[in-house]
A protein has these predicted regions:
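Short, internal strand/loop/helix patches
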Residues: 90-94, 105-139
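N-terminal "domain-start" segment that seeds a small globular fold
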Residues: 21-44, 65-70
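Thiol/disulfide oxidoreductase modules built on the thioredoxin-like
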Residues: 126-165
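Structural microenvironment flanking redox-active thiols in thiol-disulfide oxidoreductases
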Residues: 64-114
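Bacterial Sec-dependent N-terminal signal peptides
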Residues: 1-23
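Solvent-exposed loop/turn segments at secondary-structure junctions
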Residues: 61-64, 96-101, 128-130, 159-160
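Short active-site neighborhood of thiol/selenol oxidoreductases, capturing the structured segment around
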Residues: 44-70
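Loop/turn elements at helix/coil->beta-strand transitions in domains of secreted/extracellular proteins
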Residues: 51-54, 85-90, 118-120, 140-141, ...
């Protein structure tokens, strides 16, 4: 009987643990952390930019240009005289490599060009981690805005209309 009760408790805890990991991130939620690498193998977490508001572009490489107009507008606002304080803001990309047929070598080349264009960091999600941890859609372009405490302040899926920026 003790073994049966112990087994049930272990299974229940395991199920709760699995459900806690698979969350749909919503505005107002604290975002679960992650660890991703850049093209050189350097590891990054959200704490790599501690104290900054984060604009995270989670991108399927097949639609990597979809929100360039929005990113151009944000880049303009982070320059001198803009409305965004570049000392308190960091925009970067996470490539959803699991959602594409493109080879990783080509993806790294495309990402390198984007990193230069927007003077930013590009990280790689090879396993679809944010699809599982944050409930982000695959085969899409999603922009997530987190405040300095890593609370979600905005989620934009797909193309961002000009009226939003």
């Amino acid at each position: 009987m003790k073994k049966l009760v112990l087994s049930i408790v272990v299974i229940a805890i395991s199920m709760l643990s699995m459900n806690a990991q698979n969350v749909n991130l919503k505005v107002g939620d604290k975002a679960p952390d992650w660890v991703f690498t850049d093209a050189d193998g350097n590891e990054f977490t959200m704490n790599s930019w501690k104290g900054k508001v984060l604009q995270i572009n989670y991108v399927d490489p097949d639609v990597s240009d979809l929100n360039d107009p929005a990113n151009d507008a944000i880049k303009k606002e982070t320059k001198a005289g803009g409305r965004i304080d570049s000392e308190k803001f960091k925009g970067f990309g996470i490539v959803d490599t699991k959602s594409t047929w493109k080879p990783n070598m080509l993806i790294r080349t495309i990402a390198g060009n984007k990193a230069k264009k927007f003077d930013t960091t590009i990280l790689f999600d090879y396993k679809g981690t944010l699809q599982e941890k944050w409930g982000l859609p695959k085969d899409n372009y999603t922009m997530v805005i987190l405040d300095k405490d890593r609370v979600c302040r905005g989620i934009y899926k797909g193309e961002i209309p000009e009226s939003k920026f």
